[in-house]
Amino acid sequence: MPSPIALLTAATERIERVDAEALLLHALDCDRAWLFTHGDIPLAAAATESFQALVEQRARGIPVAYLIGRRGFWTLDVMVSSATLIPRAETETLVEQALQRLDHASERRVADLGTGSGAIALAIACERPQAQVLATDNSAAALDIAARNASAHGLNHVVFREGDWYEALLGERFDLIVSNPPYIAVTDPHLTQGDLRFEPPSALISGGDGLDALRILTAGAPAYLRPGGWLVMEHGWDQGAAMRTLLHTAGLVAVATVQDLEARDRVTVGRCPGF
């Protein structure tokens, strides 16, 4: 029977080492410390076959997050499935900007539109436990994953509703509306590359220029924000200028675009006047 290190070495001929390690840890249900202190022991046939099957799937392009069923985001280990977008590091910029505009007052109300796995809503709820957080999505399958994530992290006060964008808010108003909506143009060649090939198109594609969902969300925001409330939106690296125009057109003030850690436009914010 091969050892963990032998399996890992063989796998790196087909896939990236970081991916191979993640898959091996998953197949063995162990941590890195165990792996590298027991790296030379023979493995059972079942564990070997499980790992090799995962490597085969990864070699075909299936994202590691879908193969192991989870992804780290913020301080959370988030369950994901093919019904949800895979949380990405750049989206932590969105969470940071939301938290900067959300104090610890218990009456603060937050809506995360298009929550997917719930990563954004749960990160905010974790950092602002007094806030009333509502997370919405038009996918029942995604909401099921999000609710399971909330339960796993003891964030059972987060409320989930099914609905398309603002229809799920039922006319309520919020101190902060946050969203990472689809913002990729239907003709974007990146859709045929990498992990994007396997993620739900409805969570990625938004019309001919990628702005359809962003237009809906910015135009509708004033009707659902309290005076002084903030809209915080993630978007593509080349959409910052368009987003600022959309927020200004919607009547929001203090409009600004924030860059991610790679110095790319990633989040645009605006405040509802009247406060």
Swiss-Prot record:
GO terms for molecular function: nucleic acid binding; protein-(glutamine-N5) methyltransferase activity; protein-glutamine N-methyltransferase activity. Its EC number is 2.1.1.297. It is an enzyme of class 2 (transferase). The gene is prmC. Coiled coil: none annotated. S-adenosyl-L-methionine binds at residues 114-118, 137, 165, 180. It comes from the Bacteria. Belongs to the protein N5-glutamine methyltransferase family. PrmC subfamily. Gene3D superfamilies: DNA helicase RuvA subunit, C-terminal domain (1.10.8.10), Vaccinia Virus protein VP39 (3.40.50.150). The keyword Methyltransferase applies. Substrate binds at residues 180-183. InterPro entries: DNA_methylase_N6_adenine_CS (IPR002052), HemK-like (IPR004556), N5-glutamine_MTase (IPR050320), PrmC_N (IPR040758), RF_methyltr_PrmC (IPR019874), SAM-dependent_MTases_sf (IPR029063), Small_mtfrase_dom (IPR007848). Methylates the class 1 translation termination release factors RF1/PrfA and RF2/PrfB on the glutamine residue of the universally conserved GGQ motif. It holds the Pfam family PrmC_N. Keywords: Methyltransferase, S-adenosyl-L-methionine, Transferase. This is Release factor glutamine methyltransferase. GO terms for biological process: methylation.
